[in-house]
A protein has these predicted regions:
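Basic, helix-initiating cap at the start of DNA-binding domains
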Residues: 1-23, 27-39, 53
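Short secondary-structure transition hinges
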Residues: 91-128, 139, 148
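Hydrophobic alpha-helical connector segments
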Residues: 57, 71-97, 146-153, 181
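All-alpha amphipathic helical-bundle segments outside canonical DNA-binding/catalytic cores
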Residues: 81-84, 117-119, 136-154, 173-178
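C-terminal peripheral helix-coil segments that are non-catalytic and often amphipathic
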Residues: 92, 125-137, 155-204
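Alpha-helical DNA-contacting segments of helix-turn-helix folds
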Residues: 48, 54-62, 104
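Short hydrophobic/aromatic patch on the recognition helix
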Residues: 37-48
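Hydrophobic/aromatic residues within well-ordered alpha-helical segments
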Residues: 8, 51, 62, 66, ...
Length: 204
């Protein structure tokens, strides 16, 4: 029995992510995707028009709610750590994909093919609320308006991931993200990571 359109898209998209991660986006053809997904070319073109179309599909079906569990957020000690968990998940996803494919995604975003920046800033409303709570509870000492400060945490994540991709993975992306976020927000000393925690961060 033939797969429904949505199931076929999911099957191809998951196979595509494996192929892109293992071989690199530019080295993978539509034929490779069809073979990996176990579908005919005609089936591929029934639901997608190109490799880029697969990437667009993946981005349209990804948001903060799908990458971070409520259990993780509830287990965090404070709202700053909740913001960190969300931002760090984007870092983890990029490391799982590898620096080369992450660089490809950034390139596609610059070409207007996907909205990488929009995906990250889909959490802005969360970050604004969490920032306001942190300021109220003395975790964040910066007096900048939450509406300005919260979204900057996403920008920091992009900055460090860009540096990591440019340096082919030889960059302390996680510790730099944490250090810069703490500095930007002027996080109270009691809530900052220790030197040992920063050192251990990039071993994960």
């Amino acid at each position: 029995m033939a797969e429904t359109g949505s199931r076929l898209q999911d099957t191809i998209a998951q196979a595509a992510m494996r192929c892109f991660r293992e071989k690199g986006y530019d080295s993978v053809s539509v034929a490779d995707l069809c073979e990996a997904a176990g579908v005919a070319r005609s089936s591929f073109y029934r639901v997608f028009s190109s490799k880029k179309d697969v990437i667009r599909f993946l981005f349209e079906h990804t948001d903060a709610n799908s990458i971070v569990s409520i259990e993780e957020l509830l287990a965090a000690e404070n709202d700053f750590d909740r913001m960190w968990i969300i931002g760090d998940r984007y870092i983890s996803l990029s490391k799982e994909l590898g620096y080369a494919f992450t660089a490809t995604l950034m390139s596609l975003s610059l070409q207007g093919e996907i909205d990488l920046l929009g995906l990250g800033h889909s959490v802005d409303a969360w970050f604004i609320r969490l920032t306001r709570s942190c300021q109220k509870n003395g975790v964040i000492l910066s007096a900048e308006p939450p509406e300005r400060l919260g979204p900057l945490f996403v920008d920091i994540t992009y900055q460090v991931l860009y540096a990591w991709a440019c340096r082919r993975g030889r960059y302390p992306v996680r510790s730099e993200a944490r250090r810069r976020t703490e500095m930007l927000a002027n996080v109270a000393p009691a809530y900052r990571w220790s030197a040992q925690q920063l050192e251990n961060a990039d071993r994960a």
